[in-house]
Curated annotation (Swiss-Prot):
One of its GO terms (biological process) is aromatic amino acid family biosynthetic process. Its EC number is 2.5.1.19. The keyword Acetylation does not apply. PANTHER family: AROM/DEHYDROQUINATE SYNTHASE, PENTAFUNCTIONAL AROM POLYPEPTIDE. 3-phosphoshikimate binds at K26, S27, R31, S170, S171, Q172, S199, E314, H343. This is 3-phosphoshikimate 1-carboxyvinyltransferase. It catalyses: 3-phosphoshikimate + phosphoenolpyruvate = 5-O-(1-carboxyvinyl)-3-phosphoshikimate + phosphate. PROSITE patterns: EPSP_SYNTHASE_1, EPSP_SYNTHASE_2. It comes from the Bacteria. It comes from Mycobacterium sp. (strain JLS). It is found in: Cytoplasm. The lineage of its organism: Bacteria, Bacillati, Actinomycetota, Actinomycetes, Mycobacteriales.
Length: 438
């Protein structure tokens, strides 16, 4: 990429020992922001521990475009949300490369009385959105276009009712509709008509947060969600650390044979905490959890593993990196992630290209990857403007001298402090989010 310098990924022959504080969850932050905006008729909401990154700043900017007031209170991670839904004529929402903005806000815009245009990065135009837009149209919403850029012609209300949608490409289709469903006149029933919904824990997170905001949701029937009409309550939201962003750091403990501790790990979470721990245990790590932290102790040498990542697809790049630097000859199978071909980039093709480009053995399957660990050599690891790909390259680089990551700055999508936190971890310092404790 022109104008982008490569970042020399640090390597280490010695075990990594570090304690880290990870900034807030992107998934929780952006859901809390949307719910806080929808609750403004009831009052002002506050959010503590919010993630500040490109994705969350895009959400804040988009909500401001729609007329809401979102401001920092004391620190960047403490927010107040007020105002109301009142986009100006000609309003244009910039989605960037944020799937949550792209999929959560068209239903909100439909409740306004203005026409709102949505657009984003060039790469975002390949991200799936047509099923969500078709679902809104079936509810009577007027929409021009079936992909970016498109316009939502708000008429002040949405009738609601039952919508059938194929969400096999993204669980965010379901979450995006549910978040606004209580404000539809008749509420909303969503019926998923396709194959299994990927990243199901994120749908469960949406349901849980809606209930925390006083919204009645019935999810007792598989592939069917009913949101009763009613108010969204204004309240205070506390955001957990982003457990997905913790995985590269925990992986550093695995591949180096060291021990990495993440403070503030929640005892109970709507994030896929249990899945993360189970995956790390599959590679022979010892996982210890207390009321205040999670610690992973690695073995440096470990065998291959077989794992279904359908519900936690965002972890695939990091898990693929773990597989690539396992004991040479170890075979790992990553399954259930065909939907990753529609993420920030085609992550399966990208992982295969980058691992093979460093001398590894990675083959695509219909729904995942088969990786045979092999001695790797240095070279450029391309990020594809994908934060998870860049972080995966850093894991590979720990065990492979001479790896350079193209566009490490793309990690700003969810963790702007990543390069400094990675360096601090390897320097034996305590790596923390600059806002922690402020």
């Amino acid at each position: 990429m022109d104008g982008v310098s490569n970042w020399p990924a640090p390597s280490t022959p010695t075990p990594v020992h570090a304690t880290l504080t990870i900034p807030g969850s992107k998934s929780q932050t952006n859901r809390a922001l949307v719910l806080a905006a929808l609750a403004t008729p009831q009052g002002t909401s506050t959010i503590s521990g919010a993630l500040r990154s490109r994705d969350t700043d895009l959400m804040i900017g988009a909500l401001q475009t729609l007329g809401f007031d979102v401001e920092s209170v004391g620190t960047d991670s403490d927010l107040r949300v007020g105002g109301g839904l009142a986009p100006a004529a000609g309003a244009r929402v910039d989605c960037g490369l944020a799937g949550t903005v792209l999929r959560f806000l068209p239903p909100v815009a439909a409740l306004s009385t203005e026409t709102v245009e949505f657009d984003g990065d060039e790469q975002a135009r390949a991200r799936p959105i047509a099923p969500l837009l078709a679902g809104l149209q079936s509810l009577g919403v007027r929409i021009d276009g079936d992909g970016l850029p498109f316009r939502v012609r708000g008429e002040g209300s949405v009738a609601g009712g039952t919508v059938e949608i194929d969400a096999s490409a993204s669980s965010q289709f379901v979450s995006g509709l549910m978040l606004s469903g209580a404000l539809f006149r008749d509420g909303l029933t969503i019926v998923h008509t396709g194959e299994s919904v990927p990243s199901a824990p994120h749908v469960a997170m949406t349901v849980s947060m809606l209930r925390d905001a006083g919204v009645e949701v019935d999810d007792t029937e598989t592939n069917r969600w009913t949101v009763r009409p009613g108010r969204v309550a204004a309240r205070h939201w506390t955001i957990e650390p982003d457990l997905s962003n913790a995985v590269p750091f925990l992986s550093a403990g695995v591949v180096s044979g060291g021990a990495v501790r993440v403070t503030g790990w929640p005892a109970v979470s709507t994030q896929p905490a249990a899945a993360i721990m189970a995956i790390l245990e599959k590679v022979g790590a010892v996982v210890r959890q207390s009321e205040s932290y999670l610690e992973v102790q690695g073995t440096r040498q470990y065998q291959g593993f077989d794992v279904d990542l359908h519900d936690v697809g965002e972890l695939t790049p990091a898990v693929a990196a773990l597989a690539a630097v396992a004991t040479p000859g170890a075979v790992s199978r990553l399954r259930g992630v065909a939907h990753l071909r529609g993420h920030e980039t085609d992550r399966l093709a990208a992982l295969s290209a980058e691992i093979n480009g460093l001398g590894g053995q990675c083959e695509e399957t219909a729904d995942g990857l088969v990786i045979t660990a092999a001695p790797l050599h240095g070279g450029v690891w391309h990020s594809y403007a994908d934060h998870r790909m860049a972080m995966a390259g850093a894991i590979v680089g720990l065990r492979t001298p001479g790896v350079e990551i193209e566009d490490i700055a793309t990690t700003a999508k969810t963790l702007p402090e990543f390069p400094q936190m990675w360096a601090d971890m390897l320097a034996g310092q305590t790596a923390t989010d600059p806002e922690a404790g402020a």
